[in-house]
A protein has these predicted regions:
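Alpha/beta enzyme core
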Residues: 1-131
Length: 131
């Protein structure tokens, strides 16, 4: 009867500028312990899954085997229960800088800007009717 909730640990994208850019989480014992505590808390809160973003691969692998909800990785190694990627990053709509794990498969952002530029050039060539 509740709302399904997916938890999120590791990098929180909305904090990238505040923390000085993209970086891996879980490199220190203190950070690893904090991630473990957060994952357990999310499990206990009833999350149906937990996103592990930009985490140390070994820590993510350990967490995947220690919590019941699936651990869905995004830049956290191949030992997670599943993988996701932000579509805008994958297709090249996100401006730089990108996280180190993102390898865009297209450059739709650049293609879109080029298309808009062509449109503007064409529009400026249309004669203006004087009233």
């Amino acid at each position: 009867t509740g709302i399904p909730v997916m938890g999120h640990i590791g990098l929180l994208p909305q904090t990238v500028k505040a923390i000085g850019g993209y970086r891996k989480f879980g490199g220190s014992r203190e950070e690893a312990d904090s991630l473990y505590t957060d994952a357990i808390s999310l499990e206990e809160a009833g999350c149906f899954a937990v996103i592990a973003e930009m985490m140390d691969e070994k820590i993510a692998a350990q967490l995947a085997s220690q919590i019941l909800p699936p651990l869905i990785g995004i830049g956290s190694g191949n030992e997670c229960d599943g993988q996701i990627l932000v579509t805008h990053d994958l297709i090249g709509l996100t401006p730089s800088p990108l996280p180190s794990f993102v390898k865009p498969c297209a450059s739709l952002g650049l293609d879109g800007l080029n298309a808009l530029s062509v449109y503007v050039q064409r529009t400026r060539k249309i004669p203006v009717k004087k009233k």
